Amino acid sequence: MIREWKNDCQRIEKQRASDTMVQERKNEKPVRIFNTNSSFQDQAPTCCQEDLSSASPLRIWSKFYRSDPRIALGKYSPLEKEILRLGGIHTIAARRLLAYKQEEECRMLKELQLLSPDYKQAMEYKKKHSSPCAICVPLEKIWTAKVIAPLEAFKMPQREQVNVSKHIERMRLARALGNHQPLPYIERFTRSSFLSGVGLGPMAKNKARRKEDNYDTHNCDDANQDKKEEAEGKNTKRREIKMNVVFKSKEPKKCLTYHGNDRKSFLPAKKPERSIAGLTNRNLFCISEFPGDLMLMNQDFISRRDHFSDLVKTYSLEEESIWKERMRKATPYHY
Protein backbone atom coordinates (compact mmCIF):
# COMPACT_ATOMS: atom_id res chain seq x y z
CA MET A 1 0.00 0.00 0.00
CA ILE A 2 2.88 2.36 0.80
CA ARG A 3 4.51 1.59 -2.53
CA GLU A 4 1.29 2.40 -4.36
CA TRP A 5 1.07 5.69 -2.46
CA LYS A 6 4.67 6.50 -3.46
CA ASN A 7 3.95 5.79 -7.11
CA ASP A 8 0.78 7.90 -7.06
CA CYS A 9 2.64 10.81 -5.45
CA GLN A 10 5.41 10.67 -8.04
CA ARG A 11 2.92 10.47 -10.92
CA ILE A 12 0.93 13.44 -9.59
CA GLU A 13 4.11 15.52 -9.15
CA LYS A 14 5.19 14.81 -12.73
CA GLN A 15 1.77 15.77 -14.08
CA ARG A 16 1.72 19.01 -12.10
CA ALA A 17 5.25 19.90 -13.18
CA SER A 18 4.37 19.35 -16.84
CA ASP A 19 1.20 21.44 -16.46
CA THR A 20 3.12 24.32 -14.87
CA MET A 21 5.74 24.25 -17.64
CA VAL A 22 2.99 24.52 -20.25
CA GLN A 23 1.36 27.41 -18.40
CA GLU A 24 4.67 29.28 -18.08
CA ARG A 25 5.32 28.93 -21.77
CA LYS A 26 1.86 30.23 -22.59
CA ASN A 27 1.64 33.10 -20.10
CA GLU A 28 5.41 33.69 -19.72
CA LYS A 29 4.84 34.22 -15.97
CA PRO A 30 6.31 32.18 -13.15
CA VAL A 31 3.70 29.98 -11.51
CA ARG A 32 4.14 28.65 -7.98
CA ILE A 33 4.57 24.88 -7.82
CA PHE A 34 2.34 23.23 -5.21
CA ASN A 35 4.29 20.31 -3.86
CA THR A 36 2.77 17.54 -1.79
CA ASN A 37 5.31 18.29 0.91
CA SER A 38 4.02 21.85 1.46
CA SER A 39 1.29 20.71 3.87
CA PHE A 40 3.78 18.81 5.96
CA GLN A 41 6.15 21.78 5.80
CA ASP A 42 3.50 24.10 7.22
CA GLN A 43 2.34 21.68 9.92
CA ALA A 44 5.69 20.35 11.07
CA PRO A 45 8.36 23.08 11.39
CA THR A 46 10.88 20.53 12.66
CA CYS A 47 10.92 18.89 9.23
CA CYS A 48 11.90 22.13 7.48
CA GLN A 49 15.54 21.74 8.38
CA GLU A 50 15.96 18.88 5.91
CA ASP A 51 15.47 19.03 2.19
CA LEU A 52 11.91 17.77 1.85
CA SER A 53 12.04 17.70 -1.91
CA SER A 54 14.56 14.87 -1.81
CA ALA A 55 12.87 13.08 1.13
CA SER A 56 10.46 10.23 0.44
CA PRO A 57 6.78 10.53 1.45
CA LEU A 58 7.20 7.60 3.86
CA ARG A 59 9.87 9.46 5.84
CA ILE A 60 7.76 12.60 5.96
CA TRP A 61 4.77 10.57 7.15
CA SER A 62 6.77 8.79 9.84
CA LYS A 63 8.30 12.04 11.11
CA PHE A 64 4.99 13.87 11.13
CA TYR A 65 3.19 11.03 12.99
CA ARG A 66 6.06 10.12 15.27
CA SER A 67 3.72 9.72 18.26
CA ASP A 68 1.81 6.88 16.57
CA PRO A 69 3.41 3.59 17.70
CA ARG A 70 2.08 1.68 14.67
CA ILE A 71 4.11 3.65 12.12
CA ALA A 72 7.86 3.17 11.97
CA LEU A 73 10.50 4.10 9.46
CA GLY A 74 12.91 1.38 10.39
CA LYS A 75 12.52 -2.32 11.05
CA TYR A 76 10.51 -2.06 14.29
CA SER A 77 7.81 0.28 15.52
CA PRO A 78 8.22 2.09 18.88
CA LEU A 79 5.97 -0.46 20.57
CA GLU A 80 8.01 -3.35 19.17
CA LYS A 81 11.21 -1.65 20.28
CA GLU A 82 9.79 -1.30 23.79
CA ILE A 83 8.85 -5.00 23.82
CA LEU A 84 12.37 -5.94 22.70
CA ARG A 85 13.83 -3.69 25.37
CA LEU A 86 11.77 -5.49 28.02
CA GLY A 87 13.16 -8.84 26.90
CA GLY A 88 10.70 -10.15 24.34
CA ILE A 89 7.03 -10.99 24.07
CA HIS A 90 7.20 -13.89 26.55
CA THR A 91 8.42 -11.83 29.52
CA ILE A 92 6.11 -10.70 32.30
CA ALA A 93 6.98 -7.03 31.80
CA ALA A 94 6.08 -7.17 28.10
CA ARG A 95 2.76 -8.86 28.84
CA ARG A 96 1.93 -6.22 31.43
CA LEU A 97 2.79 -3.51 28.92
CA LEU A 98 0.51 -5.06 26.28
CA ALA A 99 -2.32 -5.45 28.79
CA TYR A 100 -1.94 -1.81 29.85
CA LYS A 101 -1.94 -0.65 26.21
CA GLN A 102 -5.07 -2.69 25.50
CA GLU A 103 -6.89 -1.26 28.53
CA GLU A 104 -5.86 2.24 27.51
CA GLU A 105 -7.14 1.67 23.98
CA CYS A 106 -10.48 0.30 25.25
CA ARG A 107 -10.84 3.27 27.61
CA MET A 108 -10.14 5.72 24.80
CA LEU A 109 -12.60 3.92 22.53
CA LYS A 110 -15.37 4.16 25.14
CA GLU A 111 -14.70 7.87 25.62
CA LEU A 112 -14.88 8.46 21.88
CA GLN A 113 -18.10 6.45 21.66
CA LEU A 114 -19.68 8.58 24.39
CA LEU A 115 -18.68 11.76 22.58
CA SER A 116 -19.80 10.56 19.15
CA PRO A 117 -23.43 11.40 18.20
CA ASP A 118 -23.30 8.96 15.29
CA TYR A 119 -22.55 6.08 17.63
CA LYS A 120 -25.48 7.02 19.88
CA GLN A 121 -27.78 7.23 16.87
CA ALA A 122 -26.60 3.85 15.62
CA MET A 123 -27.17 2.23 19.02
CA GLU A 124 -30.69 3.70 19.26
CA TYR A 125 -31.49 2.43 15.78
CA LYS A 126 -30.16 -1.01 16.72
CA LYS A 127 -32.32 -1.13 19.86
CA LYS A 128 -35.46 -0.15 17.95
CA HIS A 129 -35.06 -2.47 14.99
CA SER A 130 -33.39 -5.44 16.65
CA SER A 131 -35.71 -8.43 17.08
CA PRO A 132 -35.37 -10.56 20.23
CA CYS A 133 -33.52 -13.77 19.63
CA ALA A 134 -35.61 -16.88 20.23
CA ILE A 135 -32.63 -18.82 21.54
CA CYS A 136 -31.29 -16.12 23.87
CA VAL A 137 -34.64 -14.98 25.36
CA PRO A 138 -36.93 -17.83 26.53
CA LEU A 139 -40.53 -17.50 25.44
CA GLU A 140 -42.66 -17.19 28.59
CA LYS A 141 -46.22 -16.17 29.32
CA ILE A 142 -47.46 -14.85 32.66
CA TRP A 143 -50.97 -15.79 33.72
CA THR A 144 -52.97 -14.81 36.80
CA ALA A 145 -54.59 -17.77 38.52
CA LYS A 146 -56.99 -18.02 41.45
CA VAL A 147 -56.22 -20.60 44.10
CA ILE A 148 -58.80 -21.49 46.76
CA ALA A 149 -57.31 -23.04 49.89
CA PRO A 150 -58.46 -23.42 53.51
CA LEU A 151 -57.14 -21.14 56.23
CA GLU A 152 -55.35 -24.04 57.92
CA ALA A 153 -52.91 -24.22 55.02
CA PHE A 154 -51.66 -20.71 55.79
CA LYS A 155 -51.08 -21.27 59.49
CA MET A 156 -47.70 -21.89 61.00
CA PRO A 157 -47.19 -25.26 62.69
CA GLN A 158 -47.34 -25.27 66.47
CA ARG A 159 -43.81 -26.53 66.91
CA GLU A 160 -42.45 -23.72 64.74
CA GLN A 161 -44.52 -21.17 66.66
CA VAL A 162 -42.99 -22.36 69.95
CA ASN A 163 -39.46 -22.14 68.51
CA VAL A 164 -40.09 -18.63 67.19
CA SER A 165 -41.53 -17.44 70.50
CA LYS A 166 -38.56 -18.87 72.40
CA HIS A 167 -36.15 -17.17 70.03
CA ILE A 168 -37.94 -13.82 70.43
CA GLU A 169 -37.82 -14.11 74.21
CA ARG A 170 -34.11 -14.94 74.12
CA MET A 171 -33.39 -11.90 71.97
CA ARG A 172 -35.38 -9.65 74.29
CA LEU A 173 -33.51 -10.98 77.30
CA ALA A 174 -30.12 -10.52 75.61
CA ARG A 175 -30.98 -6.96 74.59
CA ALA A 176 -32.16 -6.13 78.12
CA LEU A 177 -29.03 -7.58 79.69
CA GLY A 178 -26.83 -5.70 77.21
CA ASN A 179 -28.55 -2.37 77.90
CA HIS A 180 -28.69 -3.05 81.68
CA GLN A 181 -32.46 -2.63 81.71
CA PRO A 182 -34.39 -4.75 84.25
CA LEU A 183 -37.46 -6.46 82.86
CA PRO A 184 -40.41 -7.89 84.81
CA TYR A 185 -40.16 -11.30 83.11
CA ILE A 186 -36.42 -11.81 83.69
CA GLU A 187 -37.17 -13.89 86.80
CA ARG A 188 -39.32 -16.23 84.73
CA PHE A 189 -36.46 -16.69 82.26
CA THR A 190 -33.99 -17.44 85.00
CA ARG A 191 -36.28 -20.16 86.37
CA SER A 192 -36.79 -21.76 82.96
CA SER A 193 -34.20 -23.63 80.92
CA PHE A 194 -33.42 -20.76 78.58
CA LEU A 195 -30.30 -20.20 80.59
CA SER A 196 -27.57 -22.82 80.65
CA GLY A 197 -28.09 -23.81 84.29
CA VAL A 198 -24.40 -23.52 85.25
CA GLY A 199 -23.87 -23.32 89.01
CA LEU A 200 -27.11 -25.09 89.89
CA GLY A 201 -27.29 -28.31 91.78
CA PRO A 202 -28.89 -31.51 90.48
CA MET A 203 -32.11 -30.86 92.41
CA ALA A 204 -32.44 -27.34 90.97
CA LYS A 205 -31.82 -28.64 87.46
CA ASN A 206 -34.55 -31.28 87.85
CA LYS A 207 -37.01 -28.65 89.08
CA ALA A 208 -36.20 -26.40 86.12
CA ARG A 209 -36.69 -29.29 83.70
CA ARG A 210 -40.07 -30.16 85.27
CA LYS A 211 -41.19 -26.54 85.00
CA GLU A 212 -40.12 -26.42 81.36
CA ASP A 213 -42.01 -29.64 80.59
CA ASN A 214 -45.11 -28.29 82.29
CA TYR A 215 -44.79 -25.06 80.29
CA ASP A 216 -44.50 -26.96 77.01
CA THR A 217 -47.43 -29.27 77.77
CA HIS A 218 -49.55 -26.26 78.77
CA ASN A 219 -48.77 -24.54 75.47
CA CYS A 220 -49.54 -27.72 73.54
CA ASP A 221 -52.90 -28.10 75.30
CA ASP A 222 -53.81 -24.51 74.50
CA ALA A 223 -52.85 -25.03 70.87
CA ASN A 224 -54.94 -28.20 70.64
CA GLN A 225 -57.95 -26.41 72.08
CA ASP A 226 -57.54 -23.56 69.57
CA LYS A 227 -57.32 -26.07 66.74
CA LYS A 228 -60.49 -27.84 67.84
CA GLU A 229 -62.40 -24.57 68.10
CA GLU A 230 -61.26 -23.44 64.67
CA ALA A 231 -62.07 -26.83 63.12
CA GLU A 232 -65.56 -26.81 64.61
CA GLY A 233 -66.53 -23.22 63.80
CA LYS A 234 -64.56 -22.40 60.64
CA ASN A 235 -64.59 -25.51 58.51
CA THR A 236 -66.56 -23.83 55.74
CA LYS A 237 -64.40 -20.70 55.48
CA ARG A 238 -61.99 -20.62 52.57
CA ARG A 239 -59.76 -17.96 51.12
CA GLU A 240 -59.02 -16.93 47.56
CA ILE A 241 -55.51 -15.94 46.50
CA LYS A 242 -54.39 -14.34 43.26
CA MET A 243 -50.92 -15.34 42.20
CA ASN A 244 -48.87 -15.01 39.04
CA VAL A 245 -48.09 -18.31 37.36
CA VAL A 246 -45.43 -18.54 34.68
CA PHE A 247 -45.91 -21.14 31.96
CA LYS A 248 -42.81 -21.78 29.92
CA SER A 249 -43.66 -22.27 26.28
CA LYS A 250 -42.02 -24.94 24.23
CA GLU A 251 -38.62 -23.69 23.22
CA PRO A 252 -37.27 -24.70 19.80
CA LYS A 253 -34.69 -27.40 19.92
CA LYS A 254 -31.17 -26.15 19.43
CA CYS A 255 -29.39 -27.55 16.42
CA LEU A 256 -26.12 -28.90 17.69
CA THR A 257 -23.37 -29.39 15.16
CA TYR A 258 -21.29 -32.48 15.71
CA HIS A 259 -17.80 -32.92 14.42
CA GLY A 260 -16.06 -36.17 13.77
CA ASN A 261 -13.57 -35.69 16.58
CA ASP A 262 -16.30 -34.87 19.13
CA ARG A 263 -17.66 -38.40 19.12
CA LYS A 264 -14.28 -39.91 19.76
CA SER A 265 -13.22 -40.57 23.30
CA PHE A 266 -10.84 -38.10 24.88
CA LEU A 267 -8.40 -40.78 25.97
CA PRO A 268 -6.81 -42.80 23.18
CA ALA A 269 -8.06 -46.33 22.76
CA LYS A 270 -5.72 -48.95 24.13
CA LYS A 271 -4.17 -51.09 21.46
CA PRO A 272 -4.33 -54.83 22.12
CA GLU A 273 -0.95 -55.95 23.33
CA ARG A 274 0.75 -58.67 21.33
CA SER A 275 1.03 -61.71 23.52
CA ILE A 276 2.93 -64.88 22.75
CA ALA A 277 -0.08 -67.11 23.33
CA GLY A 278 -2.47 -64.83 21.43
CA LEU A 279 -3.65 -64.84 17.83
CA THR A 280 -0.51 -64.07 15.85
CA ASN A 281 0.95 -65.03 12.48
CA ARG A 282 2.29 -68.33 13.74
CA ASN A 283 -1.24 -69.64 14.04
CA LEU A 284 -1.43 -69.53 10.24
CA PHE A 285 1.53 -71.86 9.83
CA CYS A 286 1.91 -75.46 10.71
CA ILE A 287 4.10 -76.27 13.67
CA SER A 288 6.84 -77.78 11.53
CA GLU A 289 6.72 -74.92 8.98
CA PHE A 290 6.70 -72.07 11.50
CA PRO A 291 9.67 -69.75 10.70
CA GLY A 292 10.02 -68.42 14.22
CA ASP A 293 12.30 -68.90 17.13
CA LEU A 294 12.15 -72.18 19.00
CA MET A 295 12.12 -70.37 22.32
CA LEU A 296 8.96 -68.51 21.35
CA MET A 297 7.42 -71.77 20.19
CA ASN A 298 8.31 -73.33 23.50
CA GLN A 299 6.72 -70.39 25.36
CA ASP A 300 3.64 -70.79 23.21
CA PHE A 301 3.39 -74.46 24.02
CA ILE A 302 3.92 -73.84 27.73
CA SER A 303 1.18 -71.21 27.75
CA ARG A 304 -1.16 -73.68 26.06
CA ARG A 305 -0.06 -76.39 28.49
CA ASP A 306 1.08 -78.61 25.63
CA HIS A 307 4.40 -80.38 25.05
CA PHE A 308 6.31 -80.10 21.82
CA SER A 309 6.87 -83.85 21.43
CA ASP A 310 3.18 -84.63 21.90
CA LEU A 311 2.22 -82.05 19.28
CA VAL A 312 4.74 -83.44 16.81
CA LYS A 313 3.38 -86.95 17.36
CA THR A 314 -0.20 -85.84 16.84
CA TYR A 315 0.76 -83.89 13.74
CA SER A 316 2.69 -86.86 12.29
CA LEU A 317 -0.26 -89.16 12.97
CA GLU A 318 -2.62 -86.74 11.23
CA GLU A 319 -0.29 -86.57 8.21
CA GLU A 320 -0.07 -90.36 8.04
CA SER A 321 -3.84 -90.71 8.16
CA ILE A 322 -4.26 -88.11 5.40
CA TRP A 323 -1.62 -89.89 3.27
CA LYS A 324 -3.30 -93.26 3.72
CA GLU A 325 -6.67 -91.86 2.65
CA ARG A 326 -5.15 -90.38 -0.50
CA MET A 327 -3.44 -93.67 -1.34
CA ARG A 328 -6.70 -95.56 -0.95
CA LYS A 329 -8.44 -93.17 -3.32
CA ALA A 330 -5.60 -93.45 -5.85
CA THR A 331 -5.50 -97.32 -5.91
CA PRO A 332 -7.77 -98.86 -8.60
CA TYR A 333 -10.43 -101.33 -7.69
CA HIS A 334 -9.96 -104.96 -8.91
CA TYR A 335 -13.12 -106.80 -9.76
Swiss-Prot record:
Pfam families: DUF5520 (PF17658)
InterPro entries assigned: DUF5520
Biased composition (Basic and acidic residues): 210-235
Region of interest (Disordered), residue spans: 201-236
Superkingdom, natural source: Eukaryota
Chain's role: Dispensable for normal development and fertility.
The protein's name: Uncharacterized protein C10orf120
Organism expressing this protein natively: Homo sapiens
